[in-house]
C-alpha cells in the first residue's frame, strides 16, 4: 500500500466539506488537473454546494454529490459550459478516498463529483481525479455509504453538505461570483416593510393648506371606517337635505326579511327536489351501466374459458400423439437390439458358460480356505505335500523318451511340465585379449589408458619431425 502513495504526485490546495456525516478534508492535485481544481475551489467559495445532497450511492464503489437539483442531471461549471477531461499517468482509481469529476460522457464535466469507496480500475481514463480524502476524515467519508438505497441507487435518507470552506487556495486570481449575495437580496426585497411613510409638507408652497386637508381626511376616514358613505354623512350642514329618512330601517328590514325568507324556503324546496331527482337518475344510469358491464365481462369470461379449454384439449391430444410416436420408435429400436443380442448370445454362450464354471470353481475353493491361524498353516503344508507327491509321481510315470517327444508331451498334457528337464548350451570360458580385434570386442577410448598414451606420444613425435623437415 505504501508504494501507491509514493507513485501519486504531491498535492497543492485543501478544502473542508462540512457534511451531516462529519467533516471531510480534501487535498487537491492542482498542477495535474488545473481546470477541475479551479472549478471545485470557486464553487466552494461561492457556496454552490451548500445544502446539496449525495444523491447516488453504490456500495463498495462510489458516493456521488454536487448537484443542486438533487436529481443527478443538474449542475453547471464556472466556465458556463462542460470542460474537458484531465487524465494523468500517476493518478489511478486504485484505492478508496479519491475525489473525481462525475460526467455523462467524454469532456462533459460540470459541478458533480464523487468519492471512491474501493478500487475501481474500470473508471481509469474516463473520469478526472482531482483530489483525495486525507487523515481520519476518510471514516466520515465512509459513513456517507451507511444508508439504505432504492432500486435506482438513490439513498432513502441521503446525507447533506452543510457548508464548504477553502483552507488553502492554489489559485490567487479566483474572484467568486455573487450568487449567494443575490439570493439574500431577493429574499430581502420580497419582505415588505411595515413602517408607515411620513409626509414632509414643509417642502410644498401650500404646505399649511395641504396639512389641514390631510387632517380632515384622516378624521373622516376614522369615523366612517366600516360604514357606507353617502351625502347625509359627509354634508351634514346642507339645508337642502331632509333630516327624515325615506324608509324606516327597522320596518323595511322586517318586511324584506319575511318576504325573502318565504321566497328562499320555496326556492330551496324546489331546488332540493330537483337535485334529488337528478341524483336518482344518475344512480339508476350507473346501476344499468354496471349491470351491462358485468354481463359483458361474464360473457367474455365464458368465451375465454371455453376457448382456453379447447386449446388445452388440443394440446393434450398432440402430446398423446407425440408420446405414441415415440413409443413406436422405441419399440422398433428395442426389437432390433433384441435380435442382435440373440445372435451375439449364441456366439458367446459357450465362452460364457466356461467362464462361469471356472469362476464357480474358484469361488468354492476360496470358501473352503481357512482364515489366518494354526488351521491355515496346516492346510498350506498339506497342499505343499500333495504337490510334492504329484511331482514325484509325474516324474516316475513319464517313460524315458527322446527330448523332442518330452517337449510334445509337455505341450499336450498339463502334467508334462512337471517331468521336463532344463537343458541349455554351454558357454565357452575362453579368455579374450583386449588388443585382439574381434566382432565381440568393443572400442574403448580412455585417455588414461597406457595404449592411448603411447599413441599420443608417437603422433607428437611425427609432427615434430615434419616441422623439422620443413
Curated annotation (Swiss-Prot):
<dbReference type="InterPro" id="IPR002130">
    <property type="entry name" value="Cyclophilin-type_PPIase_dom"/>
</dbReference>
<feature type="coiled-coil region">
    <location>
        <begin position="281"/>
        <end position="332"/>
    </location>
</feature>
<keyword id="KW-0175">Coiled coil</keyword>
<dbReference type="GO" id="GO:0071005">
    <property type="term" value="C:U2-type precatalytic spliceosome"/>
</dbReference>
<feature type="region of interest" description="Disordered">
    <location>
        <begin position="428"/>
        <end position="470"/>
    </location>
</feature>
<dbReference type="GO" id="GO:0003755">
    <property type="term" value="F:peptidyl-prolyl cis-trans isomerase activity"/>
</dbReference>
<keyword id="KW-0539">Nucleus</keyword>
<protein>
    <recommendedName>
        <fullName>Spliceosome-associated protein CWC27 homolog</fullName>
    </recommendedName>
</protein>
<feature type="compositionally biased region" description="Basic and acidic residues">
    <location>
        <begin position="356"/>
        <end position="367"/>
    </location>
</feature>
<dbReference type="GO" id="GO:0071013">
    <property type="term" value="C:catalytic step 2 spliceosome"/>
</dbReference>
<feature type="compositionally biased region" description="Basic and acidic residues">
    <location>
        <begin position="273"/>
        <end position="337"/>
    </location>
</feature>
<dbReference type="InterPro" id="IPR029000">
    <property type="entry name" value="Cyclophilin-like_dom_sf"/>
</dbReference>
<feature type="compositionally biased region" description="Basic and acidic residues">
    <location>
        <begin position="172"/>
        <end position="192"/>
    </location>
</feature>
<feature type="compositionally biased region" description="Acidic residues">
    <location>
        <begin position="254"/>
        <end position="272"/>
    </location>
</feature>
<dbReference type="Pfam" id="PF00160">
    <property type="entry name" value="Pro_isomerase"/>
</dbReference>
<feature type="domain" description="PPIase cyclophilin-type">
    <location>
        <begin position="11"/>
        <end position="166"/>
    </location>
</feature>
<feature type="region of interest" description="Disordered">
    <location>
        <begin position="172"/>
        <end position="377"/>
    </location>
</feature>
<dbReference type="GO" id="GO:0006457">
    <property type="term" value="P:protein folding"/>
</dbReference>
<dbReference type="InterPro" id="IPR020892">
    <property type="entry name" value="Cyclophilin-type_PPIase_CS"/>
</dbReference>
<dbReference type="InterPro" id="IPR044666">
    <property type="entry name" value="Cyclophilin_A-like"/>
</dbReference>
<comment type="subunit">
    <text>Part of the activated spliceosome B/catalytic step 1 spliceosome, one of the forms of the spliceosome which has a well-formed active site but still cannot catalyze the branching reaction and is composed at least of 52 proteins, the U2, U5 and U6 snRNAs and the pre-mRNA. Recruited during early steps of activated spliceosome B maturation, it is probably one of the first proteins released from this complex as he matures to the spliceosome C complex. Component of the minor spliceosome, which splices U12-type introns.</text>
</comment>
<feature type="compositionally biased region" description="Basic and acidic residues">
    <location>
        <begin position="230"/>
        <end position="240"/>
    </location>
</feature>
<comment type="similarity">
    <text>Belongs to the cyclophilin-type PPIase family.</text>
</comment>
<comment type="function">
    <text>As part of the spliceosome, plays a role in pre-mRNA splicing. Probable inactive PPIase with no peptidyl-prolyl cis-trans isomerase activity.</text>
</comment>
Amino acid at each position: 500500500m505504501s508504494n501507491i502513495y509514493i507513485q501519486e504526485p504531491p498535492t497543492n490546495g485543501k478544502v473542508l466539506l462540512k457534511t451531516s456525516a462529519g467533516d471531510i478534508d480534501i487535498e487537491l492535485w492542482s498542477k495535474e488537473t488545473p481546470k477541475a481544481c479551479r472549478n471545485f475551489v470557486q464553487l466552494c467559495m461561492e457556496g454552490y454546494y451548500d445544502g446539496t445532497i449525495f444523491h447516488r450511492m453504490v456500495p463498495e464503489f462510489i458516493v456521488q454529490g454536487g448537484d443542486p437539483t438533487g436529481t443527478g442531471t443538474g449542475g453547471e461549471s464556472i466556465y458556463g459550459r462542460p470542460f474537458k477531461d484531465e487524465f494523468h499517468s500517476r493518478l489511478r482509481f486504485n484505492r478508496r478516498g479519491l475525489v473525481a469529476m462525475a460526467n455523462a460522457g467524454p469532456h462533459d464535466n460540470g459541478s458533480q463529483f464523487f468519492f471512491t469507496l474501493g478500487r475501481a480500475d474500470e473508471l481509469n481514463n474516463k473520469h478526472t481525479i482531482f483530489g483525495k480524502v486525507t487523515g481520519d476524515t476518510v471514516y466520515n467519508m465512509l459513513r456517507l455509504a451507511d444508508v439504505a438505497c432504492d432500486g435506482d441507487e438513490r439513498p432513502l435518507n441521503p446525507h447533506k453538505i452543510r457548508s464548504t470552506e477553502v483552507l488553502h487556495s492554489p489559485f490567487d486570481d479566483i474572484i467568486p461570483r455573487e450568487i449567494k449575495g443575490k439570493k439574500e437580496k431577493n429574499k430581502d426585497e420580497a419582505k415588505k416593510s411595515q413602517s408607515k411613510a411620513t409626509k414632509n409638507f414643509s417642502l410644498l408652497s401650500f404646505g399649511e393648506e395641504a396639512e389641514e386637508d390631510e387632517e380632515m381626511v384622516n378624521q373622516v376616514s376614522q369615523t366612517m371606517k366600516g360604514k357606507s358613505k353617502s351625502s347625509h354623512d359627509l354634508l351634514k350642514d346642507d339645508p337642502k337635505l331632509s333630516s327624515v329618512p325615506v324608509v324606516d330601517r327597522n320596518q323595511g328590514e322586517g318586511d324584506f326579511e319575511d318576504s325573502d325568507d318565504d321566497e328562499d324556503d320555496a326556492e330551496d324546496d324546489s331546488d332540493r327536489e330537483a337535485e334529488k331527482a337528478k341524483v336518482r337518475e344518475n344512480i339508476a344510469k350507473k346501476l344499468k351501466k354496471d349491470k351491462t358491464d358485468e354481463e359483458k365481462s361474464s360473457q367474455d369470461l365464458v368465451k375465454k374459458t371455453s376457448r382456453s379449454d379447447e386449446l388445452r384439449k388440443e394440446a393434450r391430444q398432440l402430446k398423446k400423439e407425440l408420446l405414441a410416436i415415440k413409443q413406436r420408435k422405441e419399440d422398433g429400436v428395442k426389437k432390433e437390439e433384441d435380435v442382435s443380442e440373440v445372435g451375439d448370445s449364441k456366439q458367446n454362450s459357450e465362452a460364457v458358460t466356461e467362464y462361469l464354471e471356472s469362476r464357480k470353481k474358484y469361488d468354492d475353493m476360496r470358501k473352503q480356505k481357512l482364515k489366518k491361524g494354526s488351521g491355515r498353516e496346516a492346510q498350506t503344508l498339506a497342499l505343499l505335500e500333495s504337490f510334492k507327491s504329484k511331482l514325484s509321481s509325474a516324474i516316475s510315470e513319464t517313460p524315458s523318451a527322446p527330448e523332442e517327444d518330452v517337449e510334445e508331451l509337455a505341450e499336450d498334457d498339463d502334467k508334462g511340465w512337471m517331468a521336463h528337464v532344463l537343458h541349455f548350451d554351454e558357454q565357452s570360458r575362453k579368455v579374450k585379449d583386449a588388443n585382439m580385434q574381434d566382432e565381440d570386442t568393443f572400442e574403448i577410448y580412455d585417455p588414461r589408458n597406457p595404449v592411448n598414451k603411447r599413441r599420443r606420444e608417437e603422433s607428437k613425435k611425427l609432427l615434430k619431425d615434419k616441422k623439422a623437415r620443413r
